[in-house]
């Protein structure tokens, strides 16, 4: 993770993504690595991979506001507006301390 953060700070987005990708391989349950990878992929405009990555994050942290907000951003950038709105609604519910997994579309 530290190598990814260093690359990110130096503006090396692709290199940062590779470091975060490696962190997810080493520890598939490391939510911070999935979050960082997902957002790096959004910045690289690799939106389909970003969406899949952030969906994994949501699986790991199903009540996390930032996870749903990040997923909403990626979906919106990919033009998947309905799905982005659903993820944004779940982010709001999570922010209020509710259970976004029970929100019906």
Q: Where do the protein language model's features map onto the residues?
A:
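Structural signature of tandem alpha-helical TPR/SEL1-like repeats
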Residues: 9-22, 44-56, 78-90, 95
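TPR alpha-solenoid repeat register
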Residues: 33, 67, 100-101
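Short, charged, intrinsically disordered terminal tails
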Residues: 96-105
């Amino acid at each position: 993770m530290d190598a990814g953060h260093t690359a990110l700070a130096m503006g090396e987005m692709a290199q940062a993504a590779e470091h975060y990708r490696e962190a997810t391989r080493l520890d598939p349950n490391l939510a911070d690595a999935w979050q960082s990878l997902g957002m790096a992929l959004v910045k690289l405009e690799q939106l389909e991979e970003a969406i899949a990555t952030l969906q994994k994050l949501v699986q790991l942290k199903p009540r996390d506001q930032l996870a749903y907000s990040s997923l909403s951003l990626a979906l919106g950038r990919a033009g998947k507006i309905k799905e982005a709105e659903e993820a944004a609604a779940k982010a709001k519910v999570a922010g209020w301390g509710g259970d976004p997994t029970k929100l019906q579309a």
